[in-house]
Amino acid sequence: MNTFGSKLRLTTFGESHGKAIGGVLDGFPAGVAIDEEFLQSEMDKRKPGGKYATSRKEADEVEILSGIFEGFSTGTPIGFIIKNSNQHSKDYDSIKDLFRPGHADFTYFSKFGVRDHRGGGRSSARETAVRVAAGAFGAMMLKEFDIDIKSGVFSIGKLKSNKIDFEFASKSEIFMLDSDIEEDAKNLILDVKNSNDSVGAATLTIINGVPAGLGEVLYDKLDARLAAAMMGINGVKGVEIGLGSQASFILGSQNNDFMDKNGFMSNNAGGILGGISNGEPIMIKTYFKPTPSIFKDQPTINLNGDEVTCALRGRHDPCIGIRGSVVANAMARLVISDMLLLNASSKLSNLKKIYS
């Protein structure tokens, strides 16, 4: 599906080497002040270019087509496009008839019987620029509720952060949360890039200001929706909320978040219990695999099933988790915005405040 969300729905379209990518954000409430400078600043965080990312240079300027009037949202669908301008489609001519290892080439072809080989087409992470734009609109809405979402890179390869500093991450070229390992992480990225390889990463997203009681029960739990949002990002192979997998190795007496008159005494649950927020910061770790596009000869097969060698050209990120941290932030914004709108009808008192 190309649509995400329940009450707040984002539909995206476009391919990596098409004329443009874009989205329609439906269900966004009227009256939200739209800050286009903030929107572009968010796009610039994800924008390609630089020695730690792909050298493909795109302006990533968002052209708003509808849903905004005199600086405020109108309540109608917000339509927008982001034009592609720096495609090098010929770089992919040599692999148009074979399946790149680690990519969605084989699975897309198995499902649809056709695929756009130019930069991965629809499966390219280029599409995530649309999510970042939509997430920026979400942030403008969340600002009205004093909900703040921060993301950064927690680990690259085997280098893990021992401290969490979002202020530093906001200034870091690679959004690294720990200043003590940033230089080593940069060197690691350049080392794998220079050896025609890639490296994985993990990001940390923390959501502050979410009141207790946000989320749905059972099949639309808040943590389930957040996990689905993160797993829908290109290259993500795992998501943890709170302690995550560590909780399976400890005792209940160690995992439970006890309470006193001041509230919770710990936050192992990561801000969510029973699929509903408990008022504590929501903590999400998202794990990205190494970029599958590497410049090493790799065995694969072609459309006829013949064994061939894949020798890639083109421009690719040596570590997709870096820009992935920006996308993770955007997806969290969309989920929380959606859940706020859904929660408005969760009890009669909420409706009375609106209609009385």
Curated annotation (Swiss-Prot):
Gene: aroC
Catalytic reaction(s) noted: 5-O-(1-carboxyvinyl)-3-phosphoshikimate = chorismate + phosphate
Associated pathway: Metabolic intermediate biosynthesis; chorismate biosynthesis; chorismate from D-erythrose 4-phosphate and phosphoenolpyruvate: step 7/7
Cofactor: FMNH2
Quaternary structure and partners: Homotetramer.
The protein, known as: Chorismate synthase
This protein's UniProt keywords: Amino-acid biosynthesis, Aromatic amino acid biosynthesis, FAD, Flavoprotein, FMN, Lyase, NADP
Keyword Amino-acid biosynthesis: yes
Cofactor: binding comment: Reduced FMN (FMNH(2)).
GO molecular function: chorismate synthase activity; FMN binding
CDD domains: Chorismate_synthase
Gene3D superfamilies assigned to the protein according to its UniProt record, in alphabetical order: Chorismate synthase AroC
Tree of life domain: Bacteria
Primary enzyme class: lyase
Binding positions for FMN per the UniProt entry: R122, S123, S124, N234, G235, G274, K289, P290, T291, P292, S293, R315
GO biological process, one term: amino acid biosynthetic process
Family statement: Belongs to the chorismate synthase family.
Enzyme Commission number, as recorded: 4.2.3.5
Organism: Campylobacter fetus subsp. fetus (strain 82-40)
Function: This reaction introduces a second double bond into the aromatic ring system.
Pfam family, one: Chorismate_synt
Residue positions binding NADP(+): R46
One Gene Ontology cellular component annotation held by this UniProt entry: cytosol
